[in-house]
């Protein structure tokens, strides 16, 4: 058990990023995540909204409970009570630690925007935090506390995104766009301030660190101004495109349903 938890350091060498072990583990995890989200989403689709949100409430307790345990344990393992400074929920994927509870327990526009936010970024964050987690899988063995807990929290984010879509909880109304933008902007600003003060690399606003963000970092020449602004801008574009495509699909469905049926 000491080896799994990394107490005293890991004796095993990391299998490596994009190794068979890495890909097998995250693919199995994502397959179970997607299957369970679709099954539960279909089961709850016709249930009252209150019942649908109970599933999100359970997911919120699970993801926050796991993360809280991880923070406390890592402070103990690293013999550093300030280790939590490097474990704040200020990455794209860990933002879900806050937005999933907002979606589960919130009311009104903030609830709607939080549901939209989890749908839009939950699965993306899950994929980036598993398949794209080059930093983690290059540093720790696949079946280790660091990677297993990270995999589980990312899987819960992905589960919530798929479940929200399948169960019909999301609205993706155009009026929610400014609130969704505001949620993202608040987290990005907080992450950048933390990056400067700690210092650290929350939201990968300082550098790519072996993730797909390295592409943007290279294209901007690592500019301390244009790189974070480009990353932030791409997030906003992604949100806008997601809403745009969804509303186009909705409009087409409405048009088709309202069109007269010839030969009836």
Residues of each region from the PLM?
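Membrane-interface helix-boundary motifs at transmembrane edges
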Residues: 43-56, 105-114, 167-178
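Aromatic-anchored segments of alpha-helical transmembrane domains
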Residues: 63-72, 122-133, 184-193
């Amino acid at each position: 058990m000491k080896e799994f938890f990394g107490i005293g350091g890991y004796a095993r060498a990391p299998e490596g990023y994009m190794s068979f072990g890495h890909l097998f583990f995250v693919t199995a995890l994502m397959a179970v995540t997607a299957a369970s989200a679709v099954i539960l989403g279909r089961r709850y689709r016709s249930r009252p909204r209150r019942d649908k949100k109970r599933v999100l409430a359970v997911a919120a307790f699970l993801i926050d409970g796991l993360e809280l345990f991880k923070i406390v344990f890592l402070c103990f393992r690293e013999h550093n009570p300030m280790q939590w400074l490097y474990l704040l929920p200020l990455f794209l994927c860990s933002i879900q630690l806050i937005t999933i509870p907002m979606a589960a327990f919130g009311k009104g526009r903030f609830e709607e925007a939080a549901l939209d936010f989890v749908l839009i970024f939950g699965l993306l964050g899950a994929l980036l935090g598993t398949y794209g987690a080059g930093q983690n899988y290059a540093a720790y063995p696949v079946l280790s506390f660091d990677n297993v807990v990270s995999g589980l929290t990312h899987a819960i984010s992905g589960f919530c995104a798929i479940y929200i879509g399948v169960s019909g909880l999301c609205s993706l109304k155009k009026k929610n766009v400014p609130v969704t933008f505001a949620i993202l902007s608040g987290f990005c600003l907080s992450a950048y301030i933390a990056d400067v003060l700690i210092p650290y690399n929350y939201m990968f606003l300082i550098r790519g660190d072996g993730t797909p963000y390295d592409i943007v970092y290279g294209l901007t020449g690592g500019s301390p101004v244009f790189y974070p602004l480009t990353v932030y801008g791409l997030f906003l574009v992604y949100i806008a495109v997601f809403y745009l495509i969804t509303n186009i699909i909705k409009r087409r469905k409405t048009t088709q349903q309202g069109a007269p049926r010839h030969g009836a």
